[in-house]
Design a protein with these regions (language model features):
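Hinge/lid segment of periplasmic solute-binding proteins
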Residues: 13-41, 108-168, 260-263, 352-358, ...
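Periplasmic solute-binding protein
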Residues: 63, 108-128, 144-191, 203, ...
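Long, aromatic- and glycine/proline-rich binding clefts that accommodate carbohydrate-like moieties
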Residues: 32-33, 46, 351-360, 409-473, ...
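Glycine-centered hinge/linker elements that transmit conformational signals in sensory
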Residues: 201-207, 244-308, 358
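Short, polar/charged alpha-helical segment
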Residues: 32-38, 55-73, 170, 174, ...
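Extracytoplasmic/periplasmic substrate-recognition and gating elements
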Residues: 151, 299-305, 313, 323, ...
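Immediate post-signal peptide segment of exported/extracytoplasmic ligand-binding proteins
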Residues: 3-49, 69-70, 154-156, 210-220, ...
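Extracytoplasmic "Venus flytrap"/periplasmic binding protein-like
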Residues: 63-143, 178-180, 184-186, 324-325, ...
Protein backbone atom coordinates (compact mmCIF):
# COMPACT_ATOMS: atom_id res chain seq x y z
CA UNK A 1 0.00 0.00 0.00
CA UNK A 2 1.26 3.47 -0.86
CA UNK A 3 1.07 6.35 1.57
CA UNK A 4 -1.16 8.16 -0.94
CA UNK A 5 -3.61 5.26 -1.00
CA UNK A 6 -3.67 5.07 2.77
CA UNK A 7 -4.24 8.81 3.03
CA UNK A 8 -7.13 8.65 0.56
CA UNK A 9 -8.73 5.82 2.53
CA UNK A 10 -8.21 7.72 5.78
CA UNK A 11 -9.98 10.74 4.32
CA UNK A 12 -12.89 8.53 3.26
CA UNK A 13 -13.27 6.98 6.71
CA UNK A 14 -13.00 10.35 8.46
CA UNK A 15 -15.63 11.84 6.16
CA UNK A 16 -18.06 8.93 6.14
CA UNK A 17 -17.66 7.03 9.44
CA UNK A 18 -15.63 8.94 12.02
CA UNK A 19 -17.84 11.99 11.68
CA UNK A 20 -18.11 12.53 15.43
CA UNK A 21 -14.74 13.20 17.03
CA UNK A 22 -13.26 15.57 19.58
CA UNK A 23 -10.52 16.25 17.01
CA UNK A 24 -10.81 18.55 14.02
CA UNK A 25 -10.78 16.91 10.57
CA UNK A 26 -7.19 18.08 10.14
CA UNK A 27 -6.18 16.59 13.49
CA UNK A 28 -7.91 13.33 12.60
CA UNK A 29 -6.04 13.16 9.32
CA UNK A 30 -2.73 13.90 11.03
CA UNK A 31 -3.40 11.07 13.49
CA UNK A 32 -4.19 8.67 10.65
CA UNK A 33 -1.08 9.74 8.72
CA UNK A 34 0.98 8.67 11.71
CA UNK A 35 -0.61 5.21 11.55
CA UNK A 36 0.09 5.01 7.81
CA UNK A 37 3.74 5.88 8.35
CA UNK A 38 4.56 3.53 11.23
CA UNK A 39 2.60 0.62 9.71
CA UNK A 40 4.98 0.30 6.74
CA UNK A 41 7.10 -2.54 8.25
CA UNK A 42 3.95 -4.60 8.88
CA UNK A 43 2.33 -4.45 5.42
CA UNK A 44 0.15 -7.49 4.61
CA UNK A 45 0.75 -9.00 8.06
CA UNK A 46 -2.39 -10.62 9.51
CA UNK A 47 -2.86 -10.28 13.25
CA UNK A 48 -5.43 -12.07 15.41
CA UNK A 49 -7.20 -10.56 18.41
CA UNK A 50 -10.16 -11.74 20.49
CA UNK A 51 -12.79 -10.16 22.74
CA UNK A 52 -16.22 -10.78 24.26
CA UNK A 53 -19.32 -10.22 22.06
CA UNK A 54 -20.77 -6.91 23.24
CA UNK A 55 -21.88 -4.17 20.83
CA UNK A 56 -18.62 -2.23 21.13
CA UNK A 57 -16.56 -5.23 20.07
CA UNK A 58 -18.97 -6.11 17.27
CA UNK A 59 -18.33 -2.62 15.91
CA UNK A 60 -14.60 -3.12 16.17
CA UNK A 61 -14.70 -6.56 14.58
CA UNK A 62 -17.01 -5.62 11.70
CA UNK A 63 -16.21 -1.98 10.97
CA UNK A 64 -12.97 -0.85 12.58
CA UNK A 65 -10.95 -3.81 11.31
CA UNK A 66 -11.82 -2.80 7.75
CA UNK A 67 -10.95 0.83 8.43
CA UNK A 68 -7.62 -0.15 10.00
CA UNK A 69 -6.72 -2.43 7.08
CA UNK A 70 -7.71 0.18 4.50
CA UNK A 71 -5.59 2.83 6.19
CA UNK A 72 -2.55 0.81 7.33
CA UNK A 73 -2.38 -2.30 5.15
CA UNK A 74 -2.32 -4.51 8.25
CA UNK A 75 -4.97 -7.26 8.20
CA UNK A 76 -6.90 -8.01 11.39
CA UNK A 77 -8.96 -11.04 12.37
CA UNK A 78 -10.96 -9.81 15.36
CA UNK A 79 -12.87 -12.71 16.90
CA UNK A 80 -15.69 -12.32 19.38
CA UNK A 81 -16.52 -15.12 21.79
CA UNK A 82 -17.93 -15.69 25.25
CA UNK A 83 -16.17 -13.85 28.06
CA UNK A 84 -15.05 -17.04 29.80
CA UNK A 85 -13.71 -18.35 26.49
CA UNK A 86 -11.52 -15.25 26.12
CA UNK A 87 -9.99 -16.05 29.50
CA UNK A 88 -9.54 -19.72 28.56
CA UNK A 89 -7.78 -18.78 25.33
CA UNK A 90 -5.42 -16.46 27.19
CA UNK A 91 -4.66 -19.11 29.80
CA UNK A 92 -3.98 -21.67 27.07
CA UNK A 93 -1.54 -19.37 25.30
CA UNK A 94 0.31 -18.72 28.55
CA UNK A 95 0.43 -22.40 29.53
CA UNK A 96 1.52 -23.68 26.10
CA UNK A 97 3.96 -20.86 25.50
CA UNK A 98 2.70 -20.68 21.90
CA UNK A 99 1.38 -17.51 20.29
CA UNK A 100 -2.30 -18.03 19.43
CA UNK A 101 -3.59 -14.45 19.52
CA UNK A 102 -1.52 -11.32 19.17
CA UNK A 103 -3.64 -9.34 21.64
CA UNK A 104 -6.65 -9.82 23.89
CA UNK A 105 -9.38 -7.48 25.03
CA UNK A 106 -9.85 -9.01 28.43
CA UNK A 107 -11.44 -7.99 31.70
CA UNK A 108 -9.41 -5.83 34.03
CA UNK A 109 -10.79 -8.19 36.69
CA UNK A 110 -7.61 -10.13 35.94
CA UNK A 111 -5.29 -7.27 36.97
CA UNK A 112 -4.22 -9.12 40.13
CA UNK A 113 -3.45 -12.17 38.00
CA UNK A 114 -1.52 -10.25 35.35
CA UNK A 115 0.52 -8.30 37.89
CA UNK A 116 1.60 -11.47 39.69
CA UNK A 117 2.08 -13.83 36.74
CA UNK A 118 5.01 -12.23 34.95
CA UNK A 119 3.42 -13.32 31.64
CA UNK A 120 1.77 -10.04 30.64
CA UNK A 121 3.53 -7.09 29.03
CA UNK A 122 3.98 -4.09 31.30
CA UNK A 123 2.71 -1.33 29.02
CA UNK A 124 4.36 1.48 30.98
CA UNK A 125 7.79 0.13 30.13
CA UNK A 126 6.77 -1.16 26.69
CA UNK A 127 5.81 2.28 25.39
CA UNK A 128 9.08 3.73 26.67
CA UNK A 129 11.28 1.02 25.19
CA UNK A 130 10.63 -1.62 22.51
CA UNK A 131 7.18 -0.22 21.71
CA UNK A 132 8.21 3.43 21.65
CA UNK A 133 8.34 3.62 17.84
CA UNK A 134 4.77 2.29 17.53
CA UNK A 135 3.13 4.28 20.33
CA UNK A 136 0.74 6.97 19.16
CA UNK A 137 1.96 10.46 20.14
CA UNK A 138 -1.66 11.56 20.63
CA UNK A 139 -2.66 8.48 22.67
CA UNK A 140 -3.04 10.80 25.71
CA UNK A 141 -3.19 8.32 28.57
CA UNK A 142 -4.33 11.07 30.95
CA UNK A 143 -7.59 11.22 28.97
CA UNK A 144 -8.53 7.63 29.91
CA UNK A 145 -10.91 7.30 32.87
CA UNK A 146 -10.06 3.71 33.85
CA UNK A 147 -6.29 3.51 34.25
CA UNK A 148 -6.48 3.05 38.02
CA UNK A 149 -8.32 -0.22 37.33
CA UNK A 150 -5.55 -1.59 35.09
CA UNK A 151 -2.52 -0.59 37.14
CA UNK A 152 -0.51 -3.05 39.23
CA UNK A 153 0.77 -2.63 42.77
CA UNK A 154 4.05 -1.52 41.20
CA UNK A 155 2.35 1.49 39.64
CA UNK A 156 2.79 0.09 36.13
CA UNK A 157 0.04 -0.13 33.51
CA UNK A 158 -0.74 -3.70 32.42
CA UNK A 159 -3.84 -3.15 30.29
CA UNK A 160 -5.19 -0.31 28.14
CA UNK A 161 -8.96 0.27 28.55
CA UNK A 162 -11.01 -0.31 25.40
CA UNK A 163 -14.54 -0.13 26.83
CA UNK A 164 -16.24 0.36 30.18
CA UNK A 165 -19.73 -0.22 31.54
CA UNK A 166 -21.14 -0.13 35.04
CA UNK A 167 -23.66 -2.17 36.97
CA UNK A 168 -26.37 0.17 38.21
CA UNK A 169 -29.95 0.29 39.49
CA UNK A 170 -32.64 0.27 36.76
CA UNK A 171 -36.28 1.21 37.25
CA UNK A 172 -39.47 2.25 35.45
CA UNK A 173 -39.45 6.00 35.96
CA UNK A 174 -42.89 6.34 34.39
CA UNK A 175 -44.47 3.99 36.94
CA UNK A 176 -42.63 5.55 39.86
CA UNK A 177 -43.99 8.95 38.74
CA UNK A 178 -47.66 7.94 38.65
CA UNK A 179 -49.63 9.82 41.36
CA UNK A 180 -51.89 6.83 42.06
CA UNK A 181 -48.96 4.46 42.62
CA UNK A 182 -47.07 7.05 44.68
CA UNK A 183 -50.08 7.59 46.93
CA UNK A 184 -50.69 3.86 47.35
CA UNK A 185 -47.05 3.18 48.20
CA UNK A 186 -46.92 5.93 50.81
CA UNK A 187 -50.15 4.74 52.42
CA UNK A 188 -48.67 1.25 52.87
CA UNK A 189 -45.01 1.92 53.69
CA UNK A 190 -45.10 5.43 55.10
CA UNK A 191 -42.59 7.08 52.80
CA UNK A 192 -42.33 8.21 49.18
CA UNK A 193 -42.03 5.88 46.22
CA UNK A 194 -38.71 6.83 44.66
CA UNK A 195 -35.18 5.72 43.93
CA UNK A 196 -34.20 3.39 46.81
CA UNK A 197 -31.17 4.45 48.80
CA UNK A 198 -30.92 1.24 50.79
CA UNK A 199 -31.80 -2.43 50.42
CA UNK A 200 -34.77 -2.08 52.77
CA UNK A 201 -36.42 0.38 50.39
CA UNK A 202 -35.60 -1.82 47.41
CA UNK A 203 -37.33 -4.71 49.17
CA UNK A 204 -40.38 -2.61 50.00
CA UNK A 205 -40.67 -1.49 46.37
CA UNK A 206 -40.26 -5.08 45.18
CA UNK A 207 -43.01 -6.19 47.54
CA UNK A 208 -45.22 -3.29 46.47
CA UNK A 209 -45.22 -4.07 42.76
CA UNK A 210 -45.24 -7.87 43.05
CA UNK A 211 -47.71 -8.31 45.88
CA UNK A 212 -49.73 -5.07 46.15
CA UNK A 213 -49.96 -3.60 42.64
CA UNK A 214 -49.85 -6.98 40.85
CA UNK A 215 -51.15 -5.66 37.52
CA UNK A 216 -50.64 -2.50 35.47
CA UNK A 217 -52.75 -1.98 32.35
CA UNK A 218 -53.91 -5.58 32.62
CA UNK A 219 -50.38 -7.01 32.66
CA UNK A 220 -48.93 -8.92 35.63
CA UNK A 221 -45.95 -6.97 36.96
CA UNK A 222 -43.05 -7.81 39.26
CA UNK A 223 -41.00 -5.66 41.58
CA UNK A 224 -37.71 -7.45 40.99
CA UNK A 225 -35.82 -9.32 38.28
CA UNK A 226 -32.75 -11.53 38.62
CA UNK A 227 -31.51 -14.99 37.67
CA UNK A 228 -30.54 -18.08 39.66
CA UNK A 229 -29.59 -21.02 37.44
CA UNK A 230 -26.51 -23.03 38.43
CA UNK A 231 -24.35 -21.69 35.64
CA UNK A 232 -21.03 -19.82 35.25
CA UNK A 233 -22.93 -16.55 34.79
CA UNK A 234 -24.09 -16.91 38.40
CA UNK A 235 -20.46 -16.25 39.37
CA UNK A 236 -20.55 -12.77 37.82
CA UNK A 237 -23.78 -12.06 39.68
CA UNK A 238 -21.76 -12.26 42.89
CA UNK A 239 -18.14 -11.53 41.99
CA UNK A 240 -19.26 -8.35 40.24
CA UNK A 241 -19.33 -6.64 43.59
CA UNK A 242 -22.56 -7.92 45.17
CA UNK A 243 -20.76 -8.32 48.48
CA UNK A 244 -19.41 -4.77 48.34
CA UNK A 245 -22.93 -3.48 47.70
CA UNK A 246 -23.99 -5.30 50.86
CA UNK A 247 -21.02 -3.77 52.68
CA UNK A 248 -18.88 -6.85 53.26
CA UNK A 249 -15.43 -5.42 52.51
CA UNK A 250 -13.28 -2.56 53.75
CA UNK A 251 -13.21 1.07 52.74
CA UNK A 252 -10.94 2.07 49.86
CA UNK A 253 -10.97 2.78 46.13
CA UNK A 254 -10.81 1.26 43.64
CA UNK A 255 -11.14 -1.71 46.02
CA UNK A 256 -11.35 -2.20 49.76
CA UNK A 257 -8.10 -2.64 51.66
CA UNK A 258 -7.01 -4.80 53.32
CA UNK A 259 -10.22 -6.80 52.63
CA UNK A 260 -11.84 -6.48 49.19
CA UNK A 261 -15.29 -7.40 47.85
CA UNK A 262 -14.22 -11.01 47.30
CA UNK A 263 -13.61 -11.18 51.03
CA UNK A 264 -9.87 -11.70 50.46
CA UNK A 265 -7.51 -10.06 52.95
CA UNK A 266 -4.11 -8.89 51.70
CA UNK A 267 -1.03 -8.05 53.77
CA UNK A 268 1.93 -6.45 51.98
CA UNK A 269 0.50 -7.54 48.59
CA UNK A 270 0.14 -11.19 49.70
CA UNK A 271 -3.39 -12.67 49.98
CA UNK A 272 -3.66 -14.24 53.43
CA UNK A 273 -7.16 -15.72 53.40
CA UNK A 274 -10.83 -15.36 52.52
CA UNK A 275 -12.43 -17.06 55.52
CA UNK A 276 -13.20 -15.10 58.67
CA UNK A 277 -10.90 -17.46 60.57
CA UNK A 278 -7.98 -16.17 58.48
CA UNK A 279 -9.05 -12.52 58.53
CA UNK A 280 -11.17 -12.58 55.39
CA UNK A 281 -14.85 -11.77 54.99
CA UNK A 282 -16.25 -14.31 52.55
CA UNK A 283 -18.32 -16.07 55.21
CA UNK A 284 -18.79 -13.01 57.40
CA UNK A 285 -22.22 -11.84 58.56
CA UNK A 286 -22.27 -9.22 55.78
CA UNK A 287 -21.54 -11.83 53.10
CA UNK A 288 -24.20 -14.18 54.46
CA UNK A 289 -26.67 -11.27 54.50
CA UNK A 290 -25.82 -10.57 50.84
CA UNK A 291 -26.56 -14.15 49.78
CA UNK A 292 -29.67 -14.42 51.93
CA UNK A 293 -31.19 -11.24 50.47
CA UNK A 294 -30.32 -12.28 46.93
CA UNK A 295 -32.20 -15.57 47.29
CA UNK A 296 -35.07 -14.08 49.28
CA UNK A 297 -35.81 -11.45 46.64
CA UNK A 298 -35.44 -13.93 43.79
CA UNK A 299 -37.99 -16.28 45.35
CA UNK A 300 -40.45 -13.70 46.69
CA UNK A 301 -40.52 -10.92 44.14
CA UNK A 302 -39.16 -12.01 40.73
CA UNK A 303 -41.09 -13.87 38.01
CA UNK A 304 -41.29 -17.58 38.94
CA UNK A 305 -39.16 -18.63 35.96
CA UNK A 306 -36.26 -16.33 36.96
CA UNK A 307 -34.74 -18.81 39.40
CA UNK A 308 -34.09 -21.20 36.50
CA UNK A 309 -32.61 -18.58 34.17
CA UNK A 310 -28.99 -17.77 33.44
CA UNK A 311 -27.86 -14.23 32.65
CA UNK A 312 -28.39 -14.62 28.90
CA UNK A 313 -32.01 -15.71 29.28
CA UNK A 314 -32.76 -13.05 31.87
CA UNK A 315 -31.44 -10.11 29.83
CA UNK A 316 -34.47 -9.47 27.60
CA UNK A 317 -37.01 -9.67 30.41
CA UNK A 318 -36.93 -6.06 31.61
CA UNK A 319 -37.44 -4.91 28.04
CA UNK A 320 -40.77 -6.75 27.90
CA UNK A 321 -42.40 -4.14 30.09
CA UNK A 322 -43.51 -5.97 33.23
CA UNK A 323 -40.55 -5.35 35.59
CA UNK A 324 -40.59 -2.34 37.94
CA UNK A 325 -36.94 -2.36 39.00
CA UNK A 326 -33.71 -4.33 38.87
CA UNK A 327 -30.91 -3.82 41.38
CA UNK A 328 -28.22 -5.46 39.26
CA UNK A 329 -28.18 -4.17 35.65
CA UNK A 330 -25.26 -3.68 33.26
CA UNK A 331 -25.21 -0.40 31.33
CA UNK A 332 -23.74 -2.27 28.35
CA UNK A 333 -27.35 -3.10 27.52
CA UNK A 334 -28.47 0.53 27.35
CA UNK A 335 -28.72 0.60 23.56
CA UNK A 336 -30.87 -2.55 23.50
CA UNK A 337 -33.43 -0.89 25.77
CA UNK A 338 -33.83 2.16 23.50
CA UNK A 339 -35.50 0.17 20.73
CA UNK A 340 -38.71 2.08 19.85
CA UNK A 341 -40.58 -1.22 19.43
CA UNK A 342 -40.16 -2.07 23.12
CA UNK A 343 -42.84 -1.22 25.70
CA UNK A 344 -40.16 0.41 27.91
CA UNK A 345 -39.63 3.27 25.42
CA UNK A 346 -41.88 5.71 23.64
CA UNK A 347 -42.34 5.68 19.86
CA UNK A 348 -39.14 7.68 19.41
CA UNK A 349 -37.06 5.32 21.53
CA UNK A 350 -36.90 7.71 24.49
CA UNK A 351 -36.68 5.59 27.66
CA UNK A 352 -39.54 5.30 30.11
CA UNK A 353 -36.88 3.93 32.45
CA UNK A 354 -33.87 5.41 34.24
CA UNK A 355 -30.62 4.17 35.69
CA UNK A 356 -29.63 5.46 39.12
CA UNK A 357 -27.12 4.79 41.92
CA UNK A 358 -27.33 1.28 43.33
CA UNK A 359 -29.03 1.03 46.74
CA UNK A 360 -26.70 0.10 49.59
CA UNK A 361 -26.87 -2.85 51.93
CA UNK A 362 -27.02 -2.62 55.71
CA UNK A 363 -23.26 -3.10 56.18
CA UNK A 364 -22.19 -0.51 53.60
CA UNK A 365 -20.23 2.51 54.88
CA UNK A 366 -19.12 5.75 53.20
CA UNK A 367 -15.70 5.31 51.62
CA UNK A 368 -16.45 1.85 50.24
CA UNK A 369 -16.87 1.08 46.55
CA UNK A 370 -20.52 1.37 45.57
CA UNK A 371 -20.79 -1.23 42.82
CA UNK A 372 -19.13 -2.88 39.86
CA UNK A 373 -17.73 -1.50 36.63
CA UNK A 374 -16.50 -3.70 33.80
CA UNK A 375 -13.36 -2.63 31.97
CA UNK A 376 -12.45 -4.55 28.84
CA UNK A 377 -8.81 -3.74 28.22
CA UNK A 378 -6.09 -4.47 25.71
CA UNK A 379 -3.69 -7.07 27.07
CA UNK A 380 -0.43 -8.15 25.42
CA UNK A 381 1.37 -11.38 26.33
CA UNK A 382 5.13 -11.69 26.52
CA UNK A 383 5.20 -14.83 24.37
CA UNK A 384 3.80 -12.94 21.38
CA UNK A 385 6.67 -12.22 18.92
CA UNK A 386 7.68 -8.56 19.07
CA UNK A 387 6.77 -7.69 15.48
CA UNK A 388 3.28 -9.16 15.91
CA UNK A 389 2.92 -7.50 19.30
CA UNK A 390 3.81 -4.15 17.75
CA UNK A 391 1.27 -4.58 14.95
CA UNK A 392 -1.41 -5.57 17.46
CA UNK A 393 -0.52 -2.57 19.59
CA UNK A 394 -1.13 -0.36 16.56
CA UNK A 395 -4.60 -1.84 16.11
CA UNK A 396 -5.34 -1.47 19.82
CA UNK A 397 -4.40 2.20 19.72
CA UNK A 398 -6.38 2.75 16.54
CA UNK A 399 -9.66 1.60 18.08
CA UNK A 400 -9.15 3.85 21.14
CA UNK A 401 -7.68 6.81 19.25
CA UNK A 402 -9.42 10.17 19.43
CA UNK A 403 -10.19 9.91 15.73
CA UNK A 404 -12.28 6.81 16.38
CA UNK A 405 -13.29 6.72 20.06
CA UNK A 406 -16.25 9.12 20.07
CA UNK A 407 -17.93 7.37 17.16
CA UNK A 408 -17.31 4.04 18.90
CA UNK A 409 -18.84 5.44 22.09
CA UNK A 410 -22.01 6.49 20.31
CA UNK A 411 -22.34 2.99 18.84
CA UNK A 412 -21.51 0.88 21.90
CA UNK A 413 -22.12 3.30 24.81
CA UNK A 414 -19.02 2.10 26.70
CA UNK A 415 -16.96 5.26 27.37
CA UNK A 416 -13.23 5.29 28.03
CA UNK A 417 -12.13 8.90 27.43
CA UNK A 418 -12.93 12.05 29.42
CA UNK A 419 -12.87 14.11 26.24
CA UNK A 420 -15.58 11.94 24.67
CA UNK A 421 -17.72 11.94 27.82
CA UNK A 422 -17.64 15.74 27.93
CA UNK A 423 -18.25 16.16 24.20
CA UNK A 424 -21.20 17.98 22.67
CA UNK A 425 -22.19 14.83 20.78
CA UNK A 426 -22.56 12.87 24.05
CA UNK A 427 -24.56 15.75 25.55
CA UNK A 428 -26.99 15.71 22.64
CA UNK A 429 -27.59 11.99 23.17
CA UNK A 430 -28.18 12.23 26.93
CA UNK A 431 -31.99 12.11 26.87
CA UNK A 432 -31.89 8.81 24.96
CA UNK A 433 -29.78 6.94 27.49
CA UNK A 434 -31.68 7.18 30.77
CA UNK A 435 -28.87 8.53 32.97
CA UNK A 436 -25.77 7.00 31.38
CA UNK A 437 -24.27 10.36 30.42
CA UNK A 438 -24.89 11.79 33.89
CA UNK A 439 -23.23 8.79 35.54
CA UNK A 440 -20.06 8.96 33.47
CA UNK A 441 -19.76 12.72 33.88
CA UNK A 442 -19.82 12.38 37.66
CA UNK A 443 -17.25 11.22 40.18
CA UNK A 444 -19.33 8.08 40.63
CA UNK A 445 -17.48 6.45 37.76
CA UNK A 446 -14.59 6.08 40.24
CA UNK A 447 -16.72 4.36 42.91
CA UNK A 448 -18.12 1.62 40.68
CA UNK A 449 -15.01 -0.46 40.12
CA UNK A 450 -13.83 -3.82 38.74
CA UNK A 451 -12.37 -6.73 40.67
CA UNK A 452 -9.01 -5.60 42.00
CA UNK A 453 -5.50 -6.58 42.96
CA UNK A 454 -6.39 -8.76 45.97
CA UNK A 455 -7.50 -11.57 43.64
CA UNK A 456 -4.28 -13.39 42.69
CA UNK A 457 -5.63 -15.73 39.99
CA UNK A 458 -9.09 -14.79 38.76
CA UNK A 459 -9.61 -17.73 36.36
CA UNK A 460 -8.64 -20.29 39.00
CA UNK A 461 -10.85 -18.76 41.69
CA UNK A 462 -13.91 -17.47 39.84
CA UNK A 463 -15.96 -20.67 39.58
CA UNK A 464 -15.99 -20.97 43.37
CA UNK A 465 -18.75 -18.37 43.34
CA UNK A 466 -21.36 -20.14 41.26
CA UNK A 467 -20.60 -23.61 42.59
CA UNK A 468 -21.28 -22.61 46.19
CA UNK A 469 -23.90 -19.89 45.74
CA UNK A 470 -26.04 -22.48 43.97
CA UNK A 471 -26.08 -24.59 47.14
CA UNK A 472 -28.12 -21.90 48.85
CA UNK A 473 -30.38 -21.27 45.86
CA UNK A 474 -31.37 -24.92 45.58
CA UNK A 475 -32.08 -25.02 49.30
CA UNK A 476 -29.68 -27.83 50.16
CA UNK A 477 -27.69 -25.39 52.32
CA UNK A 478 -28.46 -22.28 54.32
CA UNK A 479 -26.75 -19.05 53.29
CA UNK A 480 -24.30 -19.43 56.19
CA UNK A 481 -23.48 -23.04 55.30
CA UNK A 482 -22.94 -22.17 51.64
CA UNK A 483 -20.65 -19.25 52.44
CA UNK A 484 -18.71 -21.33 54.97
CA UNK A 485 -18.02 -23.93 52.28
CA UNK A 486 -17.16 -21.24 49.76
CA UNK A 487 -14.71 -19.55 52.11
CA UNK A 488 -13.01 -22.86 52.88
CA UNK A 489 -12.67 -23.67 49.19
CA UNK A 490 -11.35 -20.18 48.44
CA UNK A 491 -8.71 -20.65 51.14
CA UNK A 492 -7.82 -24.05 49.69
CA UNK A 493 -7.37 -22.59 46.24
CA UNK A 494 -5.32 -19.68 47.53
CA UNK A 495 -3.05 -22.25 49.14
CA UNK A 496 -2.82 -24.12 45.83
CA UNK A 497 -1.81 -20.91 44.05
CA UNK A 498 0.93 -20.48 46.63
CA UNK A 499 2.14 -24.05 46.02
CA UNK A 500 2.10 -23.58 42.25
CA UNK A 501 4.03 -20.34 42.66
CA UNK A 502 3.72 -16.87 41.21
CA UNK A 503 6.41 -14.46 40.13
CA UNK A 504 5.60 -12.13 43.02
CA UNK A 505 3.07 -11.40 45.76
CA UNK A 506 1.85 -15.01 45.98
CA UNK A 507 -0.66 -15.99 48.71
CA UNK A 508 0.71 -16.59 52.21
CA UNK A 509 -2.21 -17.80 54.28
CA UNK A 510 -2.73 -16.73 57.87
CA UNK A 511 -3.10 -19.46 60.42
CA UNK A 512 -6.76 -19.83 61.46
CA UNK A 513 -7.90 -18.05 64.61
CA UNK A 514 -11.15 -17.95 66.50
CA UNK A 515 -13.56 -15.94 64.33
CA UNK A 516 -14.41 -13.62 67.21
CA UNK A 517 -10.83 -12.34 67.15
CA UNK A 518 -11.21 -11.01 63.62
CA UNK A 519 -14.82 -9.88 64.07
CA UNK A 520 -13.72 -7.69 66.98
CA UNK A 521 -11.02 -5.94 64.91
CA UNK A 522 -11.74 -2.66 63.07
CA UNK A 523 -13.09 -2.95 59.53
CA UNK A 524 -13.84 -6.19 57.73
CA UNK A 525 -14.85 -8.82 58.63
CA UNK A 526 -17.64 -6.94 60.38
CA UNK A 527 -19.67 -8.39 63.26
CA UNK A 528 -23.36 -9.11 62.76
CA UNK A 529 -25.57 -6.06 63.05
CA UNK A 530 -28.32 -6.14 65.63
CA UNK A 531 -30.65 -4.86 62.90
CA UNK A 532 -30.03 -5.74 59.26
CA UNK A 533 -33.38 -4.20 58.27
CA UNK A 534 -33.14 -0.41 58.79
CA UNK A 535 -36.10 1.71 57.69
CA UNK A 536 -36.48 2.09 53.95
CA UNK A 537 -35.20 5.32 52.47
CA UNK A 538 -35.85 6.72 48.99
CA UNK A 539 -35.06 9.88 47.07
CA UNK A 540 -36.15 11.53 43.84
CA UNK A 541 -34.38 10.73 40.59
CA UNK A 542 -33.04 14.28 40.44
CA UNK A 543 -31.65 14.07 43.98
CA UNK A 544 -30.20 10.61 43.32
CA UNK A 545 -28.02 12.05 40.57
CA UNK A 546 -26.49 14.47 43.07
CA UNK A 547 -25.28 11.47 45.05
CA UNK A 548 -23.02 10.67 42.11
CA UNK A 549 -21.07 13.85 42.81
Amino acid sequence: MTCAAGRKDAQWWITNEFVESTLSKEEQLNEMEWFISVAKPFQNLTIRVVSEPIATHWYEANVLTKAFTDITGINVVHETTAEDDVVTKMETQIELGVNIYDAYIGDSDLIGTHFRSGKVVNLTDFIKNEGKDVTLPSLDLDDFIGLSFTTGLDGKLYQLPDQQFANLYWYRHDWFSRPDLKAKFKSIYGYELGVPENWSAYEDIADFFTNKVKKIDGITVYGHMDYGKKDPSLAWRFSDAWLSMAGAGDKGLPNGMPVDEWGIRVIDCHPVGASVARGGALNSPAAVYALRKYKEWLVKFAPPEAINMDERLSLPIIGQGNIAQQIFWYTAYTAILTDPSLPVTDSDGIPKWRMAPSPKGAYWEPGMKMGYQDVGAWTLLKNTPLNRRKAAWLYAQFVVSKTVSLRKLLVGLTPIRKSDINSEAFSKAANRYGGLVEFYRSNARNSWTPTGLNVPNYPFLSDVWWIYVSLAITGTHSAQQAMNKMAQEMDNRLQQIAINGQERCEPRLNKPKDENYWLSQPGAPKPKLSNEEPPGKTTSYEESLKAWD
